[in-house]
Swiss-Prot record:
The UniProt record lists the keyword Coiled coil: yes
InterPro entries attached to this UniProt entry: RIB43A (IPR008805)
Segments forming a coiled coil: 217-250, 282-308
Pfam families per the UniProt record, alphabetical: RIB43A
Name recorded for this polypeptide: RIB43A-like with coiled-coils protein 2
Source species taxonomy: Eukaryota, Metazoa, Chordata, Craniata, Vertebrata
GO cellular component entries: axonemal A tubule inner sheath; axonemal microtubule; sperm flagellum
Species: Bos taurus (Bovine)
Amino acid sequence: MEVAQPKDLKEDFVLAKRRHAELVRQKRIFNARNRIIGGDTTAWDAQVCDQNIKAATEKARDEAFAAEMRQNDKIACLSENRERRDRKNLCKAINDFQQSFQRPETRREFDLSDPLALKKDRPARQSDYDARNTISGMQKFMGEDLNFHLRKKFQEEQNREWSLQQQKEQMIGRENQKCAEDLYLKTRLQFDETAKHLQNLETATRKAVCATVKEFNKNQALESAEKKIQERKQEQEDNLAEISNMLRGDLLSENPQQAASSFGPHRVVPDRWKGMSQEQLEEIRLVQRQQVQEKLRLQEEERQRDMDWDRRRIQKARATLLFEQQQQRLQRGLRRALDCSNLSLAREQLLQKKHMKELCTNHATEDYFTQFNTGSR
């Protein structure tokens, strides 16, 4: 059974990390949409998820609010019904109590001799401007005048007239709005007909232009074809003339005199020169053999010179090695002498420390430290 070492675990972790990075890179490169568009799908998915969560949260909150509102409405309706029922029961109880225990014959001001005395008595006021109707008497309040019913009827009639007038104005406004809408619709239809007519004219004009352009292109194509035929014919004639000139010229006949230059016998015309003669080639080969021999001689001299330098370098390296060995021996001797000297000095220092430890047994006082740094230098 193999035991996993920390080094092996680290290598496995590095390999797994590389494989994961390679897979991520392949997924990023081979995805044409992300590579071309450059969109961050991870961020988009996160945004969509956040939006869905937000929408679900808002929906749940709205549903909770709606349920709470329905519950509150139900409670309010129940409370209102209970309050209305309690008020009705209270009014009924008050009426029952008044009819049972507060009858007119049980009042203090009831006269047994004349039970209708209060009904025969004059009212508190005869009119709205009665002299007995003082401020302190509190017999007249706003809205409690004797002409209240007539005034209320007049106000109702006035409100009815105002309502009829408003209805009439609203009807006139609706008729005016309908007329305006009809006029707008009629104008819109006229505009549509005009636009359709203009579009038809534009279509006809475009067709005429297309036909003209087509005819022009056809003529241009015919002219171009005719021109190409003439150019091809002229090119064939030029090619035949060129072939005839080439066959009769000095280029294919390889006349050596055509390369002679007017600047001297040592100059030639490059575009007419057909090569060197046998004498020139032999002269070049002779010069090449001489150059080869000269190069061999120089190489031999260079080899001898390199051997001489190698021999000198070896001798110098041997002398340097001997000198370094001698210096190392001298350094070892000096090192041994220095070690002996350091050993003796260490022993002396140890003895001195031991002596000072035995001699100086008192601790340093504050006066000892104040004697230092007393000046600027």
